[in-house]
């Protein structure tokens, strides 16, 4: 009697045959727990027609048992049913593939779809694996777009529908955690510069003068070098390269030696010219 009572109580307890997607780091971001996922693929196998019906519900939060094929186990999270029909006759079920919650589950995010791999389902003496891809398509309730067997034990299925889309708040995130697709957070760094500050901080006047003097020095050096080369070549154009080199070295040495005195004379003339013009502004009484 106690055994029968315990069995009855256990049968009344709810069981969880799927994954709690809300606690899964990846599945929690997708709408996979909001929709029933299923599809049918039909293949001509003359004289018969082969049909594969697929059903998926990996989230415990969504109850889609009403859409599960009759041949599948109520504890399945993924199930496939193969049936064959001859013209004018009822279809015959030839294969039922049950993937219960005991199979290994691997979830990945790819650029094209949400990838779900189920492996280790027992089918007679064989082991079956399923690679399922959920692509995002906002409109409609979803459909099976691709179904293929890579070998006798591995099937690949591609579903397209809203279940493959990210939930609001998980797509188009920017660096501030909002959905406005920009990195502005309202602080002073986001304010546009005024018209006078478009180029940032302006360089000081001394920096502009220094740059001008550097360019002037570079041009003067280039012109002096050209002058020395041309003059040395003109004086030794009928001689050898050694003659040209000696002439160039001598002229360069002389130029470098006389340059300070030349610069001093130029500076003196500039200063004297300024003083003379200043004195010219006074008249004798």
From Swiss-Prot:
Q: Where is the composition biased (Basic and acidic residues)?
A: 189-200
Transmembrane stretches in the record are 210-230
Every copy of the MRH domain together lies at: 19-167
- Look up the domain of life of the source: Eukaryota
Q: Which GO terms describe its biological process?
A: autophagy; protein transport
Q: Where in the cell is it found?
A: Cytoplasmic vesicle membrane; Golgi apparatus membrane; Mitochondrion membrane; Preautophagosomal structure membrane
Glycosylated residues (UniProt)? 199
User: Does the record bear Transmembrane in its keywords?
Assistant: yes
Q: What intrachain disulfides are recorded?
A: 21-59, 72-79, 136-165
- Keywords, comma-separated and alphabetical: Autophagy, Cytoplasmic vesicle, Disulfide bond, Glycoprotein, Golgi apparatus, Membrane, Mitochondrion, Protein transport, Signal, Transmembrane, Transmembrane helix, Transport
Q: Topology relative to the membrane, per the entry?
A: Single-pass type I membrane protein; Single-pass membrane protein
Cited function: Effector of VPS34 phosphatidylinositol 3-phosphate kinase signaling. Regulates the cytoplasm to vacuole transport (Cvt) vesicle formation. Plays a role in ATG protein retrieval from the pre-autophagosomal structure (PAS) and is especially required for autophagy-dependent cycling of ATG9.
Name of the molecule in the record: Autophagy-related protein 27
Q: Which gene encodes it?
A: ATG27
